[in-house]
Design a protein with these regions (language model features):
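An alpha-helical appendage that flanks or caps ligand/catalytic pockets
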Residues: 122-157, 196-302, 334-353
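Short, acidic/polar
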Residues: 17-29, 173-180, 287-295
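Flexible, glycine-rich active-site loops centered on histidine and acidic residues
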Residues: 2-18, 78-145, 149, 189-191, ...
């Protein structure tokens, strides 16, 4: 059982330079605590995302950490030129000693695409072609490509990734249909959706995976993304989470309210409603571990992705939450996972008799 982190890098006020420094201190804490990877969102012209260029912030993360893997979740491909992205991927992977993960998407916020002059209805086609192009560029010395959106002939690929054939690829799940595409390609995935929706997508992923890949193939990471606040008591954790989530939600809905549009992927307006939908938990280590164990069992995910820094949570509050999660929640969940694996092995052995 491994654990990751998801971060919007959402702003709540104060000097921006101080904010970045605090977030880098939090990244150092993730590294010390033994988290597997740090997954960073990309957003534009909104307080929801203070990392409109994930590569820049991730380069700083690479410098401040030693073991933590990291990467975008996701790069919205219609907003990135594929050739430049190929070069950035190679640089980040080499600079970090091969700790980069890469995530691609079409862009979840139509308003942000429109700011860049991209028609939302074109996003899927651009995404599909750009991803194919980037993977080809990472695995060939010379890039030749002809598509509807991009065409290149004889472009030398002077840079190369350290990880071969390329860094691990991630995709954000929102529906069973996207799960099917990801499973066929063997991508790692993360779902931020409510319990039942995540379950349906992960079930579809596992079904297609078994049909397409060899039985001995290692199952990719199936991530369960959840807001998490840990404190010594349930009451203390809830008070922090309720306060901070309201601030985060203001940032999340900022562009939609500004333009009078409905949210493309709505989130509940309160932390209590979020918890009812299975998308967040605040409590003592025991409470958080029990919740996550239920969610993992219900959805079929095998990788916990916590959002520990959001809204107006202070540096001290986030560091306390991360520390308690690492020292008390992680061991509880790993013990439960070990028991489950042992039981499954016993069932399999009995079936072979």
């Amino acid at each position: 059982m491994e654990f990751g982190v998801f971060d919007h890098l959402d702003r709540y006020g104060g000097a921006l330079a101080d904010y970045y420094e605090d977030r880098l201190k939090i990244a150092e804490a993730y590294d010390r605590a033994g988290f597997h990877a740090y997954h960073l969102a990309e957003h534009h012209s909104t307080p929801l995302g203070m990392a409109p260029s994930p590569s820049v912030f991730l380069a700083a993360v690479a410098e401040r950490t030693r073991r933590l893997r990291f990467g975008p979740l996701v790069w919205p491909m219609p907003l990135h030129h594929p050739l430049r992205l190929i070069e950035e991927i190679c640089m980040l992977d080499q600079l970090s000693g091969g700790r980069l993960d890469i995530g691609f998407g079409r862009g979840a916020a139509p308003i942000e695409l429109e700011y860049y002059g991209v028609a939302p209805q074109d996003a899927q086609e651009i995404y599909a072609e750009a991803v194919e192009l980037v993977i080809k560029g990472l695995t060939h010395k010379v890039l030749d490509f002809k598509g509807r959106r991009f065409s290149f002939s004889g472009v030398p690929m002077e840079l190369e990734p350290l990880q071969k054939p390329h860094p691990p690829i991630w995709y954000g799940l929102h529906a069973p249909e996207s799960a099917e595409r990801a499973a066929r390609r063997g991508l790692n995935v993360v779902s931020l959706d409510p319990t039942n929706e995540a379950r349906l997508a992960i079930e579809r992923y596992r079904t297609i995976w078994r049909q397409v890949h060899a039985p001995a193939s290692a199952l990719p990471k199936l991530g369960l993304g959840r807001f998490i606040v840990v404190a010594p008591s349930d009451a203390a954790a809830l008070a922090k989470a309720r306060r901070a989530y309201l601030v985060w939600h203001e940032s999340f809905t900022h562009l939609f309210r500004r333009h009078g549009r409905a949210q493309s992927h709505p989130r509940p307006a309160s932390f209590d409603l979020l918890t009812e939908r299975g998308q967040g938990i605040a409590g003592s280590p025991a409470t958080v571990a029990e919740f996550l164990a239920r969610e993992l069992s219900a959805t079929g995910c095998n990788y916990v992705v916590g959002q520990f820094a959001f809204g107006d949570l202070t540096l001290t509050e986030s560091l306390q939450s991360i520390g308690l999660f690492a020292s008390e929640v992680m061991p509880l969940l790993r013990a439960k996972a070990a028991v489950g694996a042992k039981e499954m092995a016993g069932v399999a052995a009995h079936g072979r008799r």
